[in-house]
Amino acid sequence: MAQQYLPGQRWISDSEAELGLGTILTQDGRMLTVLYPATGETRQYATRSAPLTRVRFVPGDEITHFEGWKMTVREVDDVDGLLVYHGLTAQNEARTLPETQLSNFIQFRLASDRLFAGQIDPLAWFSLRYHTLQHQSAQLQSSLWGLGGVRAQPIAHQLHIAKEVADRIAPRVLLADEVGLGKTIEAGLIIHRQLLSGRASRVLILVPENLQHQWLVEMRRRFNLEVALFDAERFIESDASNPFEDTQLALVSLEWLKEDERAQDAAFAAGWDLLVVDEAHHLVWHPESASAEYRLVEQLAEVIPGVLLLTATPEQLGLDSHFARLRLLDPNRFHDLDAFRAESSSYQPVAEAVQELLDEGRLSQQAHQTIHDFLGAEGEALLAAATDGDIEASSRLIRELLDRHGTGRLLFRNTRAAVQGFPERQLHPYPLPCPAEYMELPLGEHAELYPEVAFQSQQEPADEQNRWWQFDPRVEWLIDTLKMLKKYKVLVICAHAETALDLEDALRVRSGIPATVFHEGMSILERDRAAAYFADEEFGAQVLICSEIGSEGRNFQFSHHLVLFDLPAHPDLLEQRIGRLDRIGQQHTIQLHVPYLETSPQERLFKWYHEALNAFLATCPTGNALQHQFGPRLLPLLEDGDDDTFQGLIDEARAERERLEAELHAGRDRLLELNSGGGEQGTALVDAIEEQDDQFALPIYMEQLFDAFGIDSEDHSENALVLRPSEKMLDASFPLGDDEAVTITYDREQALAREDMQFLTWEHPMVQGGMDLVLSGSMGNTAVALIKNKALKPGTVLLELLFVSEVVAPRALQLSRFLPPLALRCLLDGNGNDLAAKVAFDTLNDQLESVPRASANKFVQAQRDVLATQIAAAEAKIKPRHVERVAEAQRKLKAGLDEELARLVALQAVNPSVRDSEIEALRQQREDGLAALEKAALRLEAIRVLVAG
């Protein structure tokens, strides 16, 4: 045994192939020393059990000299135990290469190379590679790719908008849903799907400073998107010439970017694919002038191909302000305000006619004439059928009208009135006597609304005997209310973090009720833990006390009792508070509990919100406008003023609200709502996601993946597992997300309630990263097994091969939709027959047993010539299937893009919102895609040798 190892021989490690080629240094009978020059590592092995395989190339192999030149082997000599290769270079020059001069960096990655080099993998890894290919192929072709993995309830209008917009090249749209309908989720879905498809690689998100944290939490928690938050400090500390170029997703506050010219220059030059702007209705524009913020966004929109503007509804904005947003998207199309006003007024009668068609099922003479004037003669047949009550004709007629709508492709706007699924609200006011301690407080800084903060600021910090919660009647009321609601989860929101912390103290000291807090001073991890403690049904807190800012971006809809311990100074903040529970999918009526101090400003603010704005029982789209209009008169009356004057203000504001709401309702564009709601397409997406959620394919696959990589999984609770790296963890780069442990769930409902758990879907970075590790490495591309089947004569050899049709092209072409990495499987018997169609992979897999590596290697070396011939024969057999798959991919690409091109060209003829650049980009994508598919190659992915026993 000792004579087989000689200094200078090249061997490769069976267990550490990444070390490259090893060179025998010494061999003293019992111990063997091997140097791996590529990494500078040295290993010592017991001679009798060294996990090494001799590197022996054969004629036809291409080998590399350590200086980098290559040659194809023609002959091999054995000179005193060392191999000497003779062959020809690419220039047909004869060369000799002793094995001592082989490149140290040779790694055997091709399946056939690794098989013949003795690098034979465990059976489980071969199976994992096959299943990884199948699952990846299915996902890349799925219409749900980028839509199904979000930690949110699947909602039809959101999914419809996301798919419609994300599937465009460089989309430029306005997302203008009413409050509470999920504009941020729509934007996140669009970003996520564009990134996964390759349509976008780099995204700039521009938001008001007070929304930065909310966006950060939403992107990370819901979409698993790692967003880099940029501010002045981070920008200055960066060593890069352009700090933005180091990140894929940047989150920037509009206030900071507006003031920092160097950061602006860097943003303009960073080469973004998509710009997302939240609260875009605050960008001020007039025909004569524009604000600095508006001009900044305008300049960015000129250099960034895709733009998403999140804004208030057009009715709330007013026509001029709405025009200002559209100018940012398409300045060539929207350059004349007067022309836009005229165009918009022409759509209103059409929208009213559509409303009549929807309500009555047929058209009056006037409505018929309105639509005829709008469509012209080409729509006459459809119009006649729709007038007679033909339902299918009515649907097609509405689609035709939508296609011609001036902003139908640019603007998506849903209203609560049009979207189903919102809960009702019930208000429970609790007037309480105002304590004497608050009567003497100085006014200012909203002290009249939050007297506990003003009172506590006057006390000594160490004075535990004089705490506001010892006398404030709201605290006693809260304790009694929580006891009464002891079976329910209760969310308490107050304006300040200090109040939230004090309330936790009060509940602990005075009642023992289990509570947890949630405020802006906590880290994201601490907030996750607090939210998880609140969500836990069995052992969790009954009450979660949140500050105003701390609860931004969080979803607590598993609760339906909301205590507003105080009231915010603005109706938008009140709506945000209620919106923590009042969301689509909430199963119960929202119970709003509002304590307030009598004869104090709190009582008047309660009446203002309830009687003037109706802000408790319904969303208040006019709240911001009314606050702006009446705020200067309201504030003095909160502190002082007689009751009659205050009541007069309430009556005036109520009348104005009713007038504005009537205007909004009259201005509703039913055509836009139909386009934005998604109809049957949106419902079909929801059904498909729910069906995917109910399948067990992902948990089964992930257990296989965890076992292969040495990740331990154990039950945590119902529908949840804890993952930990085991002592045998194979690869430290496995994207577990935590070095110690991580809790996961495959259940969407569980994930919505427990944000501390990772929600595993096919799109999750852990799943995608694990699949990438399998397919980018070589592990599992060879195997040798014993097959136990009475129908096979002992000694019979079967060869199972997996091939992949591979196309090298930019991800933005999305060729994986048409030619995904599906495994083309071939199962050859000794006569060269392909049995793959008759014997399924899993059926065969169940009949296999492992073979010791040494025995497997010995068999492979003995059968090398036969196996090499069979591999070549298998490739010849599979080639026609590859050619057929590529041709089918070309047909699908051509048909799909030709149809989309024809639709856009026809649409452009009747709707100027279709850009020339969009059509040209689609034509280019078609040409580039077909050219890339023409070069698709067949690659041998994996080999398994099966010996009947």
From Swiss-Prot:
The protein's matches in CDD domains, at most eight in alphabetical order, are given as: DEXDc_RapA, SF2_C_SNF
Record's superkingdom? Bacteria
Q: Cross-referenced PROSITE patterns, in alphabetical order?
A: HELICASE_ATP_BIND_1, HELICASE_CTER
Keyword Hydrolase assigned: yes
Which sites bind ATP?
177-184
EC numbers? 3.6.4.-
Protein function: Transcription regulator that activates transcription by stimulating RNA polymerase (RNAP) recycling in case of stress conditions such as supercoiled DNA or high salt concentrations. Probably acts by releasing the RNAP, when it is trapped or immobilized on tightly supercoiled DNA. Does not activate transcription on linear DNA. Probably not involved in DNA repair.
Spell out the family assignment given in the record's similarity comment: Belongs to the SNF2/RAD54 helicase family. RapA subfamily.
Official protein name in the record:
RNA polymerase-associated protein RapA
